[in-house]
Every structure is written in structure tokens, then in C-alpha cells.
Amino acid sequence: MSSFVERRILERFHVPNAIVKYKLEALFSDQLPVEGKGELIDLTVKGVRFETDEEIKAGSRLNIEIVLDDDEKIPLIGNVVWTKRLDINGKINSVVEFIDFDNDPEFNSYDSLEKLEALEKEYRGY
């Protein structure tokens, strides 16, 4: 009998050919912002997992754009929950949990949430 307990409430889904662009804002004026991009591994309306060459520190707040195959972009803000270097290819998996959705510009927009929900309907089980 397995002791593994699935804690995920939302089903993850994959969006073919999507990439994640991210930017970690500089905390001090003499720092440069950290930017990069990676392949989207899977997605929910609450977060994203993607693969990069660069390690991003857990706890970091990122501005993200999910770029779809048709060049549509979904802007999001989230916090890095964890990162892990993969033994297979040396790439790094990063998981980001999105902050709340609200009309306040300091939060993710409801427009972005609607786009995520549409992607979920289209690619669930993909």
C-alpha cells in the first residue's frame, strides 16, 4: 500500500509550444533585474511549472508572461514555491504560485484568469 497522498486539488494541464518569460524585479537601485524564459511544463489556474537554465530562488516574486503559440501573452504575478535541478538534462524546474486575482492593479487581473480558464477547458487531459 502506497503512503503517497495526492495534495493537488486542481488538474494540471500542458499547453503545447507555450513558453514562460519571467522577470525578477531588482530590490535595490544598483541591481539589475533578472530576466529569463523557459518551457512551460504544466499549468493550473493557480500556478505554473516551467523549465529553465537559471535557478530562481524560492520565495522570489516574479512578473510572468505565458506566451502561447499564437503569440498571445498572459501576464501574471506569482511567488516561486520551489526549484529543483533535474538529473536528466541539468535544467531547473521552477514552480510559481500565482497571487490572487482582483481588480486592483497590484494583483493578477480577472482577464488573465479568464484566459487561464479558457486554456484549461481546451487542454485539460492533454
Predicted regions and their residues:
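Hydrophobic core residues within well-ordered beta-strands of beta-rich domains
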Residues: 15, 36, 62, 74-76, ...
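Short, conserved beta-turn/loop elements at beta-strand boundaries and strand-helix junctions
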Residues: 24, 45, 83-89
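Short, charged beta-turn/beta-strand-edge "cap" motif at the junction between a beta-strand
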Residues: 67-71
